[in-house]
Design a protein with these regions (language model features):
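Substrate-binding clefts and catalytic carboxylate motifs of secreted carbohydrate-active enzymes
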Residues: 1-141
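Flexible loop/turn segments at secondary-structure boundaries
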Residues: 2, 75-82, 156, 232, ...
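Beta-sheet entry/capping signal
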Residues: 65-69, 223, 242-243
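Beta-strand-rich binding/interaction modules
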Residues: 123-165, 172-180, 187-197
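Short, exposed coil/turn segments at beta-strand boundaries within extracellular/luminal domains
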Residues: 198-203
Length: 324
């Protein structure tokens, strides 16, 4: 799921009224502020795309796959409203991704990167492989695949190319990559770009490189760590102190929800009742992170304003607090 687009409301100029979207947007704006809505829309849309890419690539990595059905390319206004589409309910673009970018991981031919992780230590060896999912009607013969590992600013950290053959209708092993990552004392956000020369087929993957630090030095003694909210913490803050509140797992059992990295599926209220009736755990219903990426806290942890794979372990092991 993602937040609905405010721009979609303008498309209803006839007898139809998007009451469902109006109600949802009104609730969010009243709670979070109208001026902040676009930030939440962008963050939830980015996470939804990240999850779609992972799901579709997972299927393409399946040998002898006959095909798949995507649920759904567009939003579904029934069943309580499922804002799950890359397009809105009117089959119009939401402006969250271009057709060209979407095809980079959902075309008749897709280059795939297979690795054990998205996060690595500086100076380590990145062992991975590239496969080609060729569902076109044409064999790729003696084609050239180019790859490059680029920094966030576009600098090439490593690159190479190789020849490949990818018969139509199958998943082909193209090449094993062994990349020695650069030594660095500062965390790097990188992008692995792969493309087949002379074609429109390309793909890219985010990954992160961190200094191999065995022990963390305390750089600022005036930042204290607290495991629960207390009078001591309150007085410390009122006196001008800086603190990080990292509650213990069982500190606030009635004010926490489970850590969920992926966006909520389809419609929360619908599957909440289904889960309760089946006596199954109910999803937290969360929609990912909205991050102040420029905060000094992230000087050594490069991040966008939305969830990405470097957050996986932290989110899965978290106990988010309900603050309102």
């Amino acid at each position: 799921q993602m937040f609905p687009s405010v721009d979609e409301l303008k498309a209803y100029t006839g007898v139809l009224r998007p009451r469902n979207l109006e109600l949802f947007i009104e609730r969010v704006e009243n709670k979070l502020g109208k001026e902040n809505y676009k930030k939440y829309f962008d963050a939830t849309a980015a996470l939804s795309l990240l999850c779609y890419k992972a799901d579709l690539e997972m299927m393409r990595r399946t040998s002898a796959l006959a095909g798949f059905q995507m649920l759904d390319l567009q939003d579904f206004p029934g069943q309580g409203t499922a804002v799950v589409g890359i397009l809105n309910a009117l089959m119009q673009s939401k402006g969250i991704i271009s057709a060209e970018e979407f095809r980079s991981w959902n075309d008749d031919v897709v280059p795939l990167w297979l690795a054990d992780s998205y996060t690595y230590f500086a100076g380590s060896e990145l062992k991975s492989s590239i496969k080609i999912s060729n569902n076109s009607a044409t064999d790729l013969k003696n084609a050239t695949l180019n790859w490059s590992l680029n920094s966030e600013k576009g600098a090439i950290l490593s690159s190479g190319s190789f020849r490949l053959n990818a018969p139509a209708g199958i998943l082909s092993e193209a090449e094993v990559l062994n990349i020695v990552l650069p030594s660095t004392d500062k965390a790097l956000a990188c992008k692995l770009n792969i493309s087949i020369a002379g074609t429109c087929y390309r793909n890219s993957y985010s990954l992160w490189i961190y200094p191999d630090i065995k022990a963390l030095a305390v750089l600022n003694n005036d930042v204290k760590l607290f495991s629960q909210y207390s009078e001591e913490l309150e007085n410390y803050l009122l006196a001008g102190g800086k603190a990080i509140l990292m509650p213990d797992k069982n500190a606030y059992p009635q004010q926490t929800i489970g850590g969920l990295f992926t966006s909520d599926y389809w419609n929360y209220s619908m599957f909440k009742s289904i889960s309760e009736n089946a006596k199954k755990p109910v999803s937290p219903g969360t929609m990912g992170l909205l991050i102040d990426a420029k905060h000094p806290l992230f000087d050594e942890f490069p991040t966008e304003t939305h969830s990405n794979w470097q957050w996986w372990a932290a989110v899965k092991n978290s106990n988010p607090l309900i603050l309102d």
